[in-house]
Amino acid sequence: MAKIKKRGVSGNAKNFITRTQAVKKLQVSLSDFRRLCIFKGIYPREPRNKKKANKGSTAPVTFYYAKDIQYLSHEPVLAKFREHKTFAKKLQRALGRGEVSDAQKLEANRPKYTLEHIIKERYPTFLDALRDIDDPLNMLFLFANMPATDKVSHRVTKEAEKLTNQWLAYVAKERLIKKVFVSIKGVYYQANVKGQEIRWLVPFKFPTNIPTDVDFRIMLTFLEFYSTLLHFVLYRLYNDSNLIYPPTIDIEKLKGIGGLSSYVLQSKDQGVSALLPQDKKIVEDDVSVQGKELSTANISKALEADNEGEEHEEVEQETVENVELDKFEASATKTAVDSLVQPSKYASPTSTLFSKFIFYVGREVPLDILELCILSCGGSVVSEVALDDLKTNSPDAYKKLDLSNITHQIIDRPKILQKVAGRTYIQPQWIFDCINKSELLPVNKYAPGETLPPHLSPWGDAGSYNPEAEKVDQSENAEEEEEDEVDEDDEDADEDEEDEEEEDEEEDEDLKAQKELELEAAGVKFSEIAEKEKKAAKKASKKRPAEEDEEKELKKIMMTNKQRKLYKKMQYGIDKKETRTQELAKKKRKIEKTKAQLDKLSKK
């Protein structure tokens, strides 16, 4: 006879462990346990049968996989947490006794930990890290725009700002921006980095009220991990592009305008140098202040981590060299038509969209958003703030500027008091819509004071309201009308075929008349049969939706209670979306009608 299994030694009871048991097993505090789980990417699990997993108890408990906790017990960072606990006790004891020198020695030998090995464990290849870089960027941009408080130190916000600016500098230098959307929450950007679509959100730089119900300890733990990850990613990206990491910083620009212009050294200088006369350009010393230099120990660690990460790559990537593309010249005998198309570094049309333009950005326009977009599309930027700064600090250089080279001026004001000849005046939305469409749009709709077209999300939901759908329908109708005209022209050429069709129709009519005569001979009227057929068709058309509703109800009966609730929620969302779409379409028709009436009145 087989032995009876003991209760709680197999199945859910063995596979899962409660959080209290996990903390007790690892011998750490709850806060350290949370930090460790965030670093290692371990999260709570939901067992199928909570009662069995909790050995008969029905109390609300958080569960983890027992294997995950066993995996955590071998983590080197766990040992550092224990060392820190011991260090804190010794430091507290020394301060309590008034032993300041001993406390200083202890502080100098404070135990420190690194997350490099965890990054390599969680992201074996570089592409894995790039695929998961969206959340780190969102978190870092959030903290970069936050003010320093008692919970978030000034050092944390400065570090986040430095990392985000380094990321934006790389994106602008390599011209990687593909989509932009300005929303209520902030500005959404999408870039194509090494073939991976990366999307992140940059909040607006408005005064923010820090909520009191947010646990910043958890967020700062995530920020610590994400900062380390972004350091790794930036180091690899800069090296692949043959750029120095960390990038150089211009202290004067950092003190003045700051932001992206101090990291991308060509951002403002490109625009200003383009305004100078060709024979009298200002020659500046190629001396700039280096940013925070990494220590030799940190550089060696990063190099070792990068080399070890490359060993785990599935596909070997060729070394990127900074070599100019070859220029192919056609032979002298060939004509201009036979000229060879030269290879371009930037394959995407968005990368060279504004390459022939110089934009003058007014002080009322957010420079950080437009600067990134314009530089990523190959354009040059001259800001009104930068020119004012140049006028104050270097009046001689300011006098040599040739402002006639500016092609576009971006303003966000309803009226312009004085216009400069040769400039195209536009509103900022023109930049975003051009990037999203990957083409230069007409500027007449974006002139100052004009009602702008709707700024739609480039990643919009297919089932949501699309104001441009009616325009597409109208264009399709126009195409159909053109096709009808073409068909009418073809009809004249196909008269013979039509004659044959008419003969066939006459034969059908003869058969129909013969059938009527047969029915009359049988004593049945043909009109009565036609009426019966019409009634049957009406009944069938009425019956069809009723049958569909009945079928839906039968399907609902077969659903479980959970599925039925989910179905109701789905239907509620669909109905709400349809109602909203109808309201917006009605609103649009009303606006267009009012606009048409105003146009008629203005013409009179």
Swiss-Prot record:
Domain of life (superkingdom): Eukaryota
A GO term, aspect molecular function: large ribosomal subunit rRNA binding
Positions of the BRCT domain: 349-448
Compositional bias segments (type: Acidic residues): 476-510
Annotated stretches, region: Disordered: 452-562, 579-604
Compartments, record wording: Nucleus, Nucleolus; Nucleus, Nucleoplasm
Gene Ontology annotations for the cellular component aspect, listed alphabetically: nucleoplasm; PeBoW complex; preribosome, large subunit precursor
PROSITE patterns noted in UniProt: BRCT
Keyword annotations from UniProtKB, A to Z: Coiled coil, Nucleus, Ribosome biogenesis, rRNA processing
Coiled-coil residue windows: 468-522, 573-604
InterPro entries: BRCT_dom, BRCT_dom_sf, PES
Chief location: nucleus
SUPFAM superfamilies in UniProt: BRCT domain
An individual GO BP term: maturation of 5.8S rRNA from tricistronic rRNA transcript (SSU-rRNA, 5.8S rRNA, LSU-rRNA)
Listed Basic and acidic residues bias regions: 593-604
Keyword Coiled coil: yes
Pfam families: BRCT_2 (PF16589), Pescadillo_N (PF06732)
Keyword Nucleus among record annotations: yes
Function recorded in the entry: Component of the NOP7 complex, which is required for maturation of the 25S and 5.8S ribosomal RNAs and formation of the 60S ribosome.
Subunit structure: Component of the NOP7 complex, composed of ERB1, NOP7 and YTM1. The complex is held together by ERB1, which interacts with NOP7 via its N-terminal domain and with YTM1 via a high-affinity interaction between the seven-bladed beta-propeller domains of the 2 proteins. The NOP7 complex associates with the 66S pre-ribosome.
Family assignment from sequence similarity: Belongs to the pescadillo family.
Protein name (record): Pescadillo homolog
Organism: Scheffersomyces stipitis (strain ATCC 58785 / CBS 6054 / NBRC 10063 / NRRL Y-11545) (Yeast)
